[in-house]
Amino acid sequence: MANNKSAKKRIKIAERNRLINKSYKSTVRTLTKKTLENCEKYKKDPNDENKDLVKTSLNKAFSLIDKAVKKNVLHKNNGANRKSKINNLVKTTLATQ
């Protein structure tokens, strides 16, 4: 256990940051899954409404990944890889229909 004031403060700050980072990572995963679900919906029923859903969910996922990279929750290469994988899937989904 920490003995001095600054060490106790660092423990408190580290815990706070861990929870914030956990929240960002969880939301990134959730938005990625929603984008994939919307791609599946579009494959089953290709119409303009589903296409808009795919595009808006892609934009939200990209935005949150960029914010996570900016706040050092994700490494920039990790963020780029995630965006690339999602984008390639969306491109193939939209191109096939």
UniProtKB/Swiss-Prot annotation:
Presence of the UniProt keyword rRNA-binding in the record: yes
GO BP terms: translation
InterPro entries (alphabetical): Ribosomal_bS20 (IPR002583), Ribosomal_bS20_sf (IPR036510)
Keywords assigned by UniProt, alphabetized: Ribonucleoprotein, Ribosomal protein, RNA-binding, rRNA-binding
Parts of the chain that traverse the membrane: none
Entry's Gene Ontology cellular component terms: small ribosomal subunit
An example molecular function term from Gene Ontology annotations: structural constituent of ribosome
Function according to Swiss-Prot or TrEMBL: Binds directly to 16S ribosomal RNA.
UniProt family annotation: Belongs to the bacterial ribosomal protein bS20 family.
Protein name: Small ribosomal subunit protein bS20
Source species: Prochlorococcus marinus (strain MIT 9312)
